[in-house]
């Protein structure tokens, strides 16, 4: 039997008093603990820091870093906070590094099983589980984006050699750092995969109303910023007509996508990145039109888990009694 692999975790947290305790308990309950977990409190103004400090003596692998400098709150800032956490890892021996959002929980064997996947495939460079999102009704449902080729930034684990080859996570103003990491890893010859047998529970209820439309507009700008191929983008949005907010949501995201063209926005990725991404998307389109393989070809496929699951079916999805104490 091979020796357990060393891994480290980094979390960027901002005003997460409602969730951070649950996430810490879930990580601390893993059958294989991380060598170090750096939690970066990014200018939090609530009790996030206080809650984290309560766990420091009990779990010596946790480190707390606080950012005091005020700055704009966007997806790029989140990645910069994660980079601040990396500064605490320079003297730690590890083979894998993972981002963990501060509102997640896991099964106790999540990381040991995920590392086993890496052990079985030496060319697997980036991987993670399938994300289940909690709605306002308390029900966890598989997110629409769950496919084997879509690993959300919230749970991305990267082999160290792969991480160094791709230059880590890149700060993207409209999000998409997970997408950039996935594509760049493949550009360097690494395999990527999300595993449906490794559920991850996201406890923050998904937004609605105006916030949902703002997010869709931002996602359209994100699609432009990474250089998505326009025909691919249009087909992807047509397929999303059937998901709330029906029809209108696709038009809002398309508006965001076209906004970048209208304003001649510069993309924060290289020309080589855009060329590689568009080759992959054109290949996906050919598969669709020649073979009709939409689920396997498009990155945001419909849910592979049609039946919702409830939090009480999974012990790791329950918040500890004292996490808000």
What is each residue range found by the language model?
Residues 105-142:
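Conserved donor NDP-sugar-binding/catalytic core segment of glycosyltransferases
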Residues 174-181:
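Acidic donor-binding loop at a coil-to-helix junction in glycosyltransferase catalytic cores
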Residues 25-34:
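Short, acidic, metal-binding catalytic loop of nucleotide-sugar glycosyltransferases
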Residues 139-158, 218-223:
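A recurrent flexible, glycine/aromatic-enriched loop bordering the glycosyltransferase active site
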Residues 41-50:
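A conserved acidic beta->alpha catalytic loop
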Residues 79-96:
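Active-site nucleotide-sugar/metal-binding loop of Leloir-type enzymes
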Residues 93-105:
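Short beta-strand-to-loop acidic/aromatic patch adjacent to the donor-nucleotide binding site
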Residues 214-314:
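Non-catalytic, C-terminal membrane-associated alpha-helical segments of glycosyltransferases
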